Structure formats: C-alpha cells, structure tokens
C-alpha cells in the first residue's frame, strides 16, 4: 500500500482559506504569532506625529527672530538676563554710522595690507574693523559663488566680557551670521564635527584668543579656513600670550597663499616699561603687520577731544604703621597663612590710604560670606606640600579664623567723616577734589583708577560715607571667582556694574585696570589716576576714557616725589616718541627676516610635534591642556576627580618633572627632560607623556582623548532617561527552576493540582489535570481564564505538601501520557527522553479528596494506563451509537482540525455534500472528501478503499484559540456551525474528551505559572520575599507606552493581567520617603537644597536603570503576552510540528530605559504591601537599598534609620520657658507631646528669622522630610481606597491632598499660623489676609470638606509649617511612621473620604482637561501633546516649544522656559480654540474619523 502523502509535499497546489484558521500547509498547527493584534497603523501614527512636531520645531526656531527676543529682553530685569542679552539690552550694540576721514583712510590701508591701527581709546577702531569685515565678507561671497572653499573671519579678544560686547556690536552692524564663543561654553570639549557646523553656518566668529588657539592646535580649524584675523587690544601680543602663539605657531608657519589678512587694534603698541621704538617694531614683526595711525592727527583731535591733564599733589605719606586693630589681629593670628596677604595689604594701606582704610579691609574680608574661602585656603595650606608626618589638621586654624571674624564683628570702626586724620593725605586730596565736582546735582561721570582690587573696594565704601549725596559710588574690578576676602566677582556682576554706570545709577566708579581697555564704558568728564599708570598703554587707555569736551585727566602725585613726577613725564614723552615713530614709518617697508627669526629664539629649546594627516600640533604649552583633558575624560559620574599630578625635583643644576596620571589611565606617566626652569620642566614632562599616549592610541589624530567622559549624574538635564527610545535586551522565556535537575531521571515527584472555579455554568465537562515536577513549586495565586463564551474561570493551583516516589514504569506511563497530550491535542511530536522531561501531566483522580488522600492516589492511574496501552482508539461501523459520542478526534495530518463528537447523524451519509454550516475547504465534493487531508495519489487511493457505509458523526470543531488568559477578540467571537465528519480519515484519541478539554487550557495555565516563576527569580536576585502575584504585577509591561496612562496603548499585549503602573505609583512615593529619611538621618548639617540634590541622584531613573541593568532585571520583565510557540517545555527534541523558528526573536525584547527604571519602583511598591515581623516597611526598606545601590541609603530595615541619626546639639539643648509653652499649646491643639521641644521650635521657625535669635535651624530641613512622609500617608490611603483607579487618576487626586492650598488651610484650621517665628512685615500681612479669607469661607459654606478649594493660594510658609511639623513629630517619636499616620487619620483624612468631589479640582489642570475634551467629548484618539527645546535660539534662557497635534494638524502652540510650562500654555491655547466647537464641526475641521474606526473595530 502506498505511503500516504502529506499536504505540504505538493507546494504548488493552492489552498482555499477557511474560517477554521489561516491558509497554511497541512502540517501546520495554525500557531503563527500575531504579535501586534492592535491597530497596525498605531506605530505609523506615532511616527507621523513625531515627524510633524520636528518640522514645526525647526520652523519655529527660524521664526523666533531677534525682534521676538528683544521684546522678551526688554521686559526682563537686568539681574535676570543672560550675559549676551544683558549686553544686547544696552547701547553696546548700537549701529555705527558715518565713518570719519581718518577711519576711511585706515580702512583703505587695511584692505591692502596687514596693519595695526594705533588710535586713542574712543576714536572708533571698531568701526574700521566693521568696514573691513564687510569688505572681506563681500569677497568671500564672490569666492563661494566661484565654488572656492568656505572661509570665516575671526574677531579675537582678550576677555570673556569683550566676547559678548564685540559680538553685540558686530551683530547690529553686519547682516551676516555672527556667533560668539568662550571657554565658559566648554568649547574645549567640542569635536571636529561641532566646529565644522559652526564654520559652515557663520561668517564671523567672535571668541577669546585661547579658543581659536586650541582649535588650531587640534586642527579643528586651520589657517586656510580663515580669511581675516582681527586682534582687539593687539598690544597683548607678546611672549606666550595666545595672540603671539597663534601667529608664531600657525600663521607664520603657513605659506603666504593660505594666510588670512590681519588687522590689529590698539591705543598703544607699547605695554611695558621698555624702549618705545623697539617695542613697536617687535609688535609689527610678531603680527606680521605694519603699524598705521591717522596721517592727519588734527582731524583725530577734532573727533576725539583730549582732556585737560592735571596733577593733583598731596602731602608726603607716612611710613606704613600698625593700627590698634592690626596689632591685635597680628598678635593672635599673624601666623595664619590664609590671612598673610590681608596683613600685607593692611599694613601698606595704613600709609597709602590711612588708618581707617587699613582697618576697613578686615570688615569685608572676614564676613560670614567670605569665611568659607578663607577656611578652604587654610585647609589647603595645612594639607599642602608638607610631608605626611608634618601635616596639621586644619580644624584649629579654621576655628581661629572664625575667632578673628568675631573680633571684627564687635570692632567699632571710627567715623572718617568726623575724623579726617584717619585718612591719608592722598585720600584727603582725592576727597577734596571730588567734592568740587559733586557738591550739587551734576551730570559728571568719574572713574578713579587704582592698582589693587582692595583699594577700589575700600575707596568705594569710604566715599559712600564721606561723599556728598550727589556722589553715587560704585566699584568695577576684574573677574576672579577664586578671590578671597570678599573680592570674588563674576563676569555678570562686572557687566551689571557697567550697566549701572551707563544708566547714571552710579556716577563715580572706583576701578582697576579692567576699566582701561575693552569694556564699553560711557564717556566720562573726570578720570583720576589714584595710582599712577605703570605703562604707556595704561596711560593712553585710561586717559581715553575722558572723552567729553572740557574733561579732566588727573594724576595724584606725592609732593616733592621725584619718582612720581618723572613717571608722569616719561609717559607723556613716550607717547610723543611713539606718535612720531608711527607717522614717520615708510609705507613700502617690509619685515626683516632676522626679526622673524628672533621671534622663535625663546622657542628653540621647546619641541613640537605635528600629525601630518590632520595638521594637529602639540607644543610644550598646549601639552598641559591636552593632558588635563585626557585625565578629565577618564572620570565616570560621581567618582573622584581625575587630576594630573606633577612632581618636581632638582638634580644636577636642573629641574626634572614627573607626570603621574590618574589611576584609571592605562599609562601612569613619564619623567620629562631636565630644564633650567620649573615651568619648562613641567611642560617637557607633559609633552613627553602626550607623545606616549599618542603612541598607544589613547590620543587621536587631533590630540583628543579616545575616552569619553560620562557627565555627572548631578546634572538634572541628564537625570531623566528616555521613555521612548528602546533597546533590545535578553528576555527569559523559561524559569531557571525547570533546568535545575533536567537530565536526571527522578525518583520522586511533586504535585500541583490544576482546577477551575467557573463564575457561570460551563457547557462542557473539564477533567482537572495534575502537574508533576521534580522541584516543589511555590503557592500560586488564583488567576482568571476565559473559556467557551468568555465565561470567567479562576484557575486554582493547589500545591500538595508532600511528593511521592515513582518507579521507572510510572515514569514511562506519565511520559507517554504527557507526550500524547502534546501530539494529539497540540500536533507536536517530541523525541521520547524521560530524563529531559521538564514536567509531566496526569489526570486527577476525581474520587479522591485532595486534602486527605495520599499523593500517589491523586492521579487517575486507570486513564494513564489506558493511554499508555492504546496509542489511539480503533473503531468499526459495528460499534454502538454510544461509542461515537463524547470523543476527542483529530486530523493527524493537519493541526487545524480537532473535534469533540456528539454522536451519529443517521440522516447523512459519507457521500453527501457537506452541509452549509461547515466552513469552506478545498474539497467540498462530499463529507468524506471534506474530512480528508491527503494529496493526489494518496487521496485517490484512500477514497477507493474507504468504507462509504460508515456513519456520519455530528461534531464540534475546536477553535484554535490558545490565549485563554484574555477574552475573545471580535474575530474569535464568530460562531462556528455544526460539523459533520467521517472518522476513517481521522484519529480517535485515547485521551478522554473531558481531559482533552482541560488540556486545551493548559498552555495558558503553564504560561502564567512560568511567568510567576520568572518573576520570583527576579525577586530572589534582589533577595526580596515578594509573593508571586505582586512579583509578576511589578514586572509586567503590557504595551509600548504603559506609562502613558490615558493615551492609546501601542502594541497592547492581551491577557497579561495587572501591569506595573499602580505598584510603580506606590513605590515611587515610598522611594522618595525612604531616601529622604536616610539623607536626613545621615546628613544632619546639610540644608534643604543639598537634600534635594542628593535625593534626586538616588531616586532618578538613571540611577535605578543602572542598578537594574547590573542585576539584569530587564531579562525578567514580562513584556510579551501568551506565545503560541513559547509555552512548550524546553529540553526535548521536536520531531514533528512547528517549533520556534530559527529567526525568532522571542528571547529578546525592546524596552525603554525608563520602563526598566519604573519596574524598580514597582518592585519597591510590591514590597510595601508585604507583611514583616517587626515593621511593615522592613522589606520595602531593604528593596530601596538594593535598588538605589548607594551609601546614602544603606539600611536593611526600618529600625536602622533611627540608628543612623546623630541627634544634633540644638535638639538636646536646654529648653527655655517659651519653648515649653509652645510645646504645651501645640499638645493641646494636636495631641502630640514633644520629648524635644526644640524640634517643634525649629518646625515653626521661618528662614527669615535670624539664626542668632532662633538658636535652632529654620524649618526647611524638617519640611523636606515631612513632605515625603505626608506624601506616603496620602498615597497609601488613596491606593488602598481606590484599587480600580489608574495611576493618572491617583496622581491627580493625590495632588489635591498634598497641595499647598489644602495644607495652608489646615495650618489655619489647626491654629498653627500664630506660632510661626518670622522676620517679615509683608509675610505677616499675607498671613492675616489669608486667615480672614479662610474664616469667611467657613462661615459662608458651612465648612464642607472641599471648602478650601474655593480660597486663594496661601503664603507658602503655612503649608511648609504643616510638613515641618510632620517631620518634627517623626524625628521626636524615634522615626515612628505611626505618628504620621495618626496625624493624617485625625486631621486630614476626613477631607478625602469622598474623592469624587475633587474630580473637578483634578480636571482643572489644562492638560488633563484637554485630554478629556479630545478623548471623551470629541471621541478622538489620534492626538498628542509634544514638547521640545527650540534649537539655536539665543534667548534669555532655554526656550521650549510645545504643540497640540490632532490628525497631523497643529491645533495650538506654547513657548516657555520649561517643558512643563510650555505644555501648559499649549493646552490652554488649544482649549481656547476648541471652546464651543460641536463634535461634528471638530470632525470636519480636523478630518477626525476615530469614532467610525472604533465602530468598525467593534463590529468585527
């Protein structure tokens, strides 16, 4: 007899689709995965929305013009503006008009040659630069049109402030793109691609010289990329200044054809006490330029009037002497090195300034604000270069500095206005002269130049006391953030000082050399050199500040002091020599090559190294910077700083330096070449180390580290992680438990009885099965399956306490039954291998009582033996009618066709056509033909030899639905009609129909059991005893956007049970509380801000994600629903049937980083619901420690929090009568009796209250703690009271419970407001008004629970008091959470018994209201609210654009400084636009057909 052929032997024969399953080869068991049963358009909708928003963002970035920004700038206060906008708001950036003749003359020269324009300060050198830039840009545009390489102009300055100032000037005078860069923008971290972008989009770049120099060194920019170099204050080009290095290292090394044009600007080419002519020639040589000045000086004089130059003589100064205060400080603290410079200045000031000024320096040098820097200096000094054995602990020195501060605080300074003898003759003369100018209201503006910063500060303070009411002094000194003695100043403060001077708010500026050059300070009519100019440049530049007609430039000169007189005369004569030299220079002169060679004389002993492929250059001086950047790149987040160490030693008349790199560097360092100077030795060592790093591939071809520094976790912008971007991670598909003893033939087995408890009567009988395993399984919770017509049935998994011994025969019987289940029911034939079986199945003995029977007796051995003995049930036509009823029948050749029989239908014969109730198949000739799944020859032979007289059996086809964990889809609800079959083409299974019916549910059951086991494995990794139910809930993610609670769920996975959302909501709150308690206990001296920053680092998603990845929690997350291929046991070889395809990715899943972090919070939430022996939060505390993985939270149970806490001194200090009275009053009101009344005092002390009076900290620390504790109490209440609400609802309604508005009303109702200690008149009136409003609201409304929602917002201090009080009782009670709960139950809970009254309050938020409007009122699901930072906008800060997009159309937009407020604005704008719009009109305008689509889906 010919062997029957399988259908898939004939691939060319087409298959007609039928409703029983998709069209496929007959071997198929119809188990193709439908991974995304949802709307297939959802991903494309999301992509379209993202694309639409990106287009909008790009468009808006261009539309937000300079005019928009100017409007914002105008409306913003000066002290709130950024540096660039602060300068833009002033007239620094005014448009320059009408060049004068001498400016045009110099411009024409600059067009032809490299020149250094020498003109007085204020004579318009910048205009010449603007004219030249416009000319160069015109040429550049022509060159670009001829497809020549792009080139850019660089305007170089010597200070950061000038970057902003000159950029503002150029932006207002040049109609091409101008950008500005300085080191503060972290330009040293930019790579070549970044610079390429800037060069491509800008015509002019204004930057500090160091920025360009570093670029040239790294070859990110080359001389051939530059068409013009402008050197502002060109006299700085000397020695190793970046101006000089740019020219020497790059400009002169390039060929003439590649060199850019050079234009220098200076008031004087001489910046030192040296021969004027020689200095000028050196500058010309160095800048490869010719000095040029106005040929007609009279024209220049007419444009820039010269001031009247005067000498103010003063009597001879006294010798430096020790004042009484100086003596006292010197005798007690003269050995403190941290105060050494102050002592030196004070002594000199006694002569130069007078006794009062000599003492006054201490008044600000030892203030509370200045002490930290002095203390830091003391600590560094103590730990400095001393050997370890001699290191002195700095605490004593710091304490002595504080003692000095106390002396100053109590010192009585004399009144210099009453006692002029306290001032030096020099200061008295200055005072005498200034009084003349400021004796009445005047427009006079004066700058007094001093040599030292302290002098400027002291004179400013002095003249604020002894000046007239019309003299308004101010101070302008150089930027130094590291200065001690109260003299640290930022760029911002410097610019604000200039702004005040420009506005006339200050009219007498005491300034150091910073006011001499560069900064655009308005014209003055009085300039005083309090300290004489030391160089010609100083002289000319400071004099140039006096530009008004009839202005005065005065030198303060000591009477009969030849040195002073000669100094002034020398400067005046030097200026004349310099001018004659400039005018007499021949026009056709060229630079002497010997002069150029002389430039490199100092560099002859310094090597350099150039990378030929890129042109990047390493020099002695640049090697220090390169090495510092390399070390910095080794730093990883919060690890210790990676600093290069340099160690010097002196041997054989030379210095030798050794470099030691940080520990993580693959190369530790090298010893440099001997050198005569310490600095050169250091540079040599750095240079040689860089070469070694380059040799080992640790520096690339641009001398940039091949490592990349991880930015600090502290940076808030980096704490958030993406909730959209997904990565592929390994996913556990089978629990580890199955593998532990696989491969070994067991001698005993454990039992789990599987059964159903239906909610309604089932139509079919289901015979329970027994799951047999090698290892004892844990107790599993009940979970639902949906059988037949979506009848919900609870699956009960009863784990039997004791196992039973099995023989080899028993195992053979059990293995046969289990494999027969896979073969007959699921069309899978496995290789028989008892040792590799994961588990076994057996029918339950229905006559046994589970609770009392022996384990072995629970198995129905009769059915097991029958199946073992009979591979199938034979039949014949002579069998009785009863034989044909209630059988399980299957098609051995086609896995789609399985039936339960009902009995014989005598009205039909095999040769009759199939009734119309049966789905169409390929062969519809007759019933016999319909039931046969063979092809051609085999089919023909079978039909020739079959019994055509056999009965026709009425049967029910079994649906191929496997995922019984969820209700049927619309497609699955299609009712199948009756089927009529012949048995000869089919096989009657030996498995009883009731057992088979239950077995069809087994894939869903075992899938959920395996999910429980995998979830428990994750908990075991963390050593957390979480129950299976909570563990699985915490690890279940059932859609791509699970966290977007009310958005349409993308790729929703059906039948997965509860997802992690609610547990995450609870865990997030507990995490906040736990870390707050730990930080509070461990850091008693930290302020609230420190707490917030540290907590932010602990609870941020980035930190949780990092820990989760370390534990590989991603593998345990359940992100995929029931798998038709994945539920089968592993270990066995599949011989027949479809297995998991080779290309399947079921062991991988895509997870967003935020999802992994959210799961951590969900696990913590799960632990909150577990009972513990001692404290109910013990396991949750342990979970937090495991998942934050930080020393800042390292406790294993609740009780350990209190052990961390070191009681601060103030808490146990002696309690005074007022504090006892306060505690008694509060006990009467609230019922809590404080052990430490100081804590209560602290809780009610406002930050404005002076600490010297309070003697306790203000409430901010306790408020930080109380806020987290109250959050937890509220969240627990709302979580348990509303088990069916999603996290969005919970969050919105929790906001009401912890809102400042509610807590403010609580403070008043409990009478706490009267106990607040504060020092603010305005606050008092605010509290009074608010209390009156609350009392009025109570009278009017009758005091309903939500009366507080109708009042205005309270002063912030009132809710802070409540939270601080909660923190205080928590600490006072020894870290008892119960007292917090008691407070909640007693005073807060009554307001929230009915949360529905707060629905309106929650929905008032514009974003929530917009969602409800679109989703509920309009029935739209294709909408989104997106936000993103607007790129390249130089506004007053970060600019974020938010947009509401409906069906690809932008409905509304909002721009703000943060995403939160931008979304708020966009939502409000969208609501305004949608107001009054009927649904039909909405659908017309936006083309919305969502409701129609939903209707169609519902009717499928």
Curated annotation (Swiss-Prot):
Q: PAZ domain spans which residues?
A: 862-990
Q: Where is the signal peptide?
A: none
The Dicer dsRNA-binding fold domain is annotated at 623-713
Domain DRBM residue range list:
1408-1476
One of the entry's Gene Ontology molecular-function terms is: ribonuclease III activity
Q: Which residues form the Helicase C-terminal domain?
A: 426-597
Region entry Disordered, spans: 1-47
Q: Which residues bind ATP?
A: 119-126
GO biological process terms, semicolon-separated: defense response to virus; regulation of defense response to virus; siRNA processing
Q: Where does Zn(2+) bind?
A: 1420, 1447, 1488, 1490
Q: What class of enzyme is it?
A: hydrolase
Q: Where is this site: Important for activity?
A: 1356
Coiled coil regions in record: none
Function of this protein?
Dicer-like endonuclease involved in cleaving double-stranded RNA in the RNA interference (RNAi) pathway. Produces 21 to 25 bp dsRNAs (siRNAs) which target the selective destruction of homologous RNAs leading to sequence-specific suppression of gene expression, called post-transcriptional gene silencing (PTGS). Part of a broad host defense response against viral infection and transposons.
Provide the protein name. Answer: Dicer-like protein 1
From what organism does this protein derive? Coccidioides immitis (strain RS)
């Amino acid at each position: 007899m010919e062997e029957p052929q399988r259908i898939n032997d004939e691939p060319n024969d087409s298959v007609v689709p039928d409703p029983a399953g998709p069209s496929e080869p007959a071997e198929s068991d119809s188990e193709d995965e439908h991974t995304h049963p949802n709307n297939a358009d959802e991903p494309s909708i999301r992509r379209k929305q993202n694309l639409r928003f990106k287009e909008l963002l790009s468009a808006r970035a261009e539309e937000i013009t300079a005019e928009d920004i100017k409007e914002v700038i105008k409306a913003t206060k000066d002290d709130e503006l950024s540096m660039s906008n602060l300068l833009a708001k002033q007239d620094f950036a005014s448009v320059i008009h009408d060049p004068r003749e001498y400016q045009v003359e110099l411009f024409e020269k600059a067009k032809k040659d490299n020149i250094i324009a020498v003109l007085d300060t204020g004579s318009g050198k910048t205009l010449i630069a603007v004219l030249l830039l416009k000319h160069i840009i015109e040429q550049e545009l022509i060159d670009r049109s001829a497809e020549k390489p792009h080139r850019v102009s660089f305007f170089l300055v010597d200070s950061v402030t000038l970057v902003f100032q000159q950029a503002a000037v150029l932006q207002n005078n040049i109609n091409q793109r101008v950008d500005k860069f300085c080191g503060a923008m972290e330009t040293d971290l930019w790579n070549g691609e970044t610079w390429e972008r800037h060069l491509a989009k800008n015509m002019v770049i204004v930057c500090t010289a160091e920025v360009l120099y570093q670029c040239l060194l790294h070859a990110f920019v080359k001389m051939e990329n530059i068409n013009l170099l402008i050197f502002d204050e060109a006299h700085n080009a000397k020695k190793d200044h970046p101006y000089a290095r740019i020219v020497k290292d790059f400009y002169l090394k390039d060929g003439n054809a590649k060199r850019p044009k050079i234009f220098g600007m200076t008031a004087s080419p001489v910046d030192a006490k040296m021969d004027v002519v020689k200095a000028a020639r050196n500058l010309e040589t160095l800048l490869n330029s010719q000095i040029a000045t106005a040929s007609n000086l009279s024209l220049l004089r007419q444009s820039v009037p010269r001031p009247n130059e005067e000498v103010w003589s003063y009597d001879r100064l006294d010798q430096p002497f020790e004042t009484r205060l100086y003596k006292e400080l010197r005798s007690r603290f003269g050995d403190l090195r941290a105060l050494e410079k102050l002592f030196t200045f004070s002594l000199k000031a006694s002569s130069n300034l007078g006794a009062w000024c000599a003492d006054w320096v201490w008044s600000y040098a030892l203030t509370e604000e200045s002490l930290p820097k002095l203390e830091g200096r003391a600590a560094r000094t103590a730990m400095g270069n001393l050997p370890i054995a001699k290191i002195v602990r700095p605490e004593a020195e710091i304490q002595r500095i504080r003692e000095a501060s106390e002396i100053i605080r109590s010192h009585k300074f004399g009144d210099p206005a009453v006692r002029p003898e306290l001032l030096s003759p020099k200061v008295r003369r200055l005072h005498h002269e200034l009084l003349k100018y400021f004796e009445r209201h005047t427009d006079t503006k004066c700058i007094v130049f001093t040599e030292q910063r302290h002098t400027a500060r002291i004179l400013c303070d002095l003249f604020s006391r002894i000046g007239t009411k019309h003299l308004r002094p101010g101070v302008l000194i150089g930027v130094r953030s590291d200065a001690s003695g109260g003299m640290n100043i930022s760029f911002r403060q410097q610019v604000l000082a200039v702004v005040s001077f420009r506005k006339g708010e200050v009219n007498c500026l005491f300034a150091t050399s910073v006011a001499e050059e560069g900064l655009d300070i308005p014209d003055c009519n009085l300039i005083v050199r309090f300290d004489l100019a030391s160089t010609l440049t100083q002289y000319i530049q400071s004099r140039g500040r006096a530009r008004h007609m009839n202005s005065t430039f005065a030198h303060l000169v000591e009477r009969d002091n030849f040195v002073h007189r000669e100094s002034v005369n020398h400067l005046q004569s030097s200026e004349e020599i310099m001018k004659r030299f400039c005018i007499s220079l021949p026009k056709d002169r060229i630079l002497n090559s010997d002069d150029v060679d002389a430039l490199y004389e100092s560099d002859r002993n310094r090597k350099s190294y150039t990378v030929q492929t890129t042109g990047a250059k390493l020099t002695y001086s640049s090697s220090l910077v390169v090495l510092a950047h390399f070390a910095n790149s080794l730093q990883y987040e919060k690890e210790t700083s990676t600093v290069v160490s340099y160690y010097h030693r002196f041997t054989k008349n030379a210095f030798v330096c050794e470099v030691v790199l940080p520990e993580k560097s693959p190369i530790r360092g090298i010893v440099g070449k001997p050198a005569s100077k310490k600095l050169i030795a250091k540079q040599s060592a750095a240079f040689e180390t860089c070469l070694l790093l380059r040799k080992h591939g640790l520096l690339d071809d641009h001398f940039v580290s091949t490592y990349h520094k991880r930015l600090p976790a502290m940076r808030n912008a980096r704490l958030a992680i993406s909730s959209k971007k997904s990565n592929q991670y390994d996913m556990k598909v089978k629990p580890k438990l199955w593998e532990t003893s696989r491969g070994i033939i067991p001698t005993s087995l454990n039992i789990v009885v599987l059964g159903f408890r239906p909610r309604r009567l089932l139509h079919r009988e289901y015979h329970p099965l027994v799951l047999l395993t090698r290892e004892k399984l844990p107790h599993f919770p009940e979970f639902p399956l949906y059988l037949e017509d979506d009848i919900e049935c609870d699956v009960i998994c009863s784990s039997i306490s004791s196992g039973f011994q099995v023989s080899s025969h028993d195992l053979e019987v059990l293995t046969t039954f289990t494999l027969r289940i896979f073969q007959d029911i699921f069309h899978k034939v496995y290789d028989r291998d008892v040792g590799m079986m994961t588990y076994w199945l057996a029918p339950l003995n229905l006559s046994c009582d589970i609770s009392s029977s022996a384990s072995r007796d629970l198995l129905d051995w009769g059915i097991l033996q029958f199946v073992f003995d009979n591979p199938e049930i034979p039949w014949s036509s002579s069998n009785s009618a009863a034989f044909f009823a209630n059988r399980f029948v299957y098609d051995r050749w086609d896995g789609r066709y399985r039936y339960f029989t009902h009995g014989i239908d005598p009205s039909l014969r095999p040769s009759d056509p199939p009734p119309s109730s049966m789905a169409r198949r390929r062969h519809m000739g007759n019933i016999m033909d319909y039931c046969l799944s063979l092809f051609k020859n085999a089919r023909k032979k079978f039909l020739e030899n079959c019994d055509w007289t056999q009965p026709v059996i009425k049967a029910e086809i079994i649906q191929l639905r496997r995922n019984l964990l969820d209700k049927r889809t619309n497609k699955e609800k299609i009712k199948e009609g009756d089927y009529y079959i012949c048995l000869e083409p089919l096989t009657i299974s030996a498995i009883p129909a009731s057992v088979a019916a239950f077995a069809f549910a087994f894939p869903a059951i075992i899938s959920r059991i395996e999910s429980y086991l995998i979830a428990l494995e994750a908990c075991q990794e963390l050593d957390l005893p979480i129950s299976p139910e909570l563990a699985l809930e915490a690890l279940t993610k059932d859609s791509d956007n699970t966290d977007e609670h009310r958005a349409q769920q993308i790729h929703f996975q059906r039948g997965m049970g509860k997802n992690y959302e609610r547990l995450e909501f609870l865990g997030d709150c507990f995490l906040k509380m736990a870390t707050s308690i730990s930080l509070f206990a461990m850091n008693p001296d930290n302020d609230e801000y420190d707490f917030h920053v540290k907590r932010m680092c602990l609870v941020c998603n980035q930190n949780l994600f990092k820990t989760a990845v370390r534990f590989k929690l991603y593998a345990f997350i359940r992100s995929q629903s029931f798998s038709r291929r994945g539920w089968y046991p592993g270990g066995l070889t599949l011989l027949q049937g479809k297995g998991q395809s080779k290309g399947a990715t079921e062991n991988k899943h895509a997870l967003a980083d935020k999802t992994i972090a959210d799961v951590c919070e969900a696990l913590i939430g799960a632990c909150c619901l577990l009972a513990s022996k001692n404290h109910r939060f013990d396991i949750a505390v342990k979970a937090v420690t495991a998942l934050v993985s930080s020393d800042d939270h390292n406790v294993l149970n609740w009780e350990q929090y209190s052990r961390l806490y070191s009681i601060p001194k103030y808490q146990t200090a002696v309690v005074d009568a007022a504090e006892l009275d306060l505690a008694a009053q509060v006990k009467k009101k609230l019922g809590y009796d404080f052990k430490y009344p100081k804590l209560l005092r602290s809780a009610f002390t406002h930050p404005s209250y002076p600490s010297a009076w309070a003697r306790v900290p203000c409430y901010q620390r306790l408020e930080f703690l109380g806020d987290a504790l109250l959050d937890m109490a509220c969240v627990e209440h709302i979580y348990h009271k509303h088990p069916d609400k999603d996290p969005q609802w919970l969050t919105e309604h929790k906001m009401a419970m912890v809102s400042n508005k509610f807590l403010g009303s609580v403070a008043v109702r409990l009478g706490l407001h009267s106990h607040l200690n504060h020092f603010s008149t305005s606050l008092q009136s605010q509290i009074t008004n608010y209390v009156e409003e609350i009392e009025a609201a109570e009278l009017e409304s009758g005091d309903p629970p939500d009366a507080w929602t109708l009042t205005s917002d309270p002063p912030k201090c009132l809710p802070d008091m409540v939270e601080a009080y909660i923190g205080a009782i928590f600490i006072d009670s020894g870290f008892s959470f119960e007292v917090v709960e008691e407070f909640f139950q007693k005073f807060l809970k009554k307001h929230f018994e009915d949360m529905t009254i707060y629905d309106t309050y929650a929905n008032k938020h514009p974003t929530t209201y917009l969602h409800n409007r679109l989703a509920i009122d309009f029935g739209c699901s294709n909408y989104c609210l997106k936000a993103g930072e607007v790129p390249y906008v130089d506004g007053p800060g970060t600019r974020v654009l938010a947009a509401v997009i409906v069906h690809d159309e932008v409905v509304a937009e909002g721009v703000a400084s943060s995403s939160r407020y931008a979304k708020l604005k966009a939502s409000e704008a969208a609501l305004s636009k949608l107001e009054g719009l009927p649904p039909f009109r909405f659908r017309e305008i936006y083309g919305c057909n969502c409701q129609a689509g939903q209707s169609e889906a519902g009717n499928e």
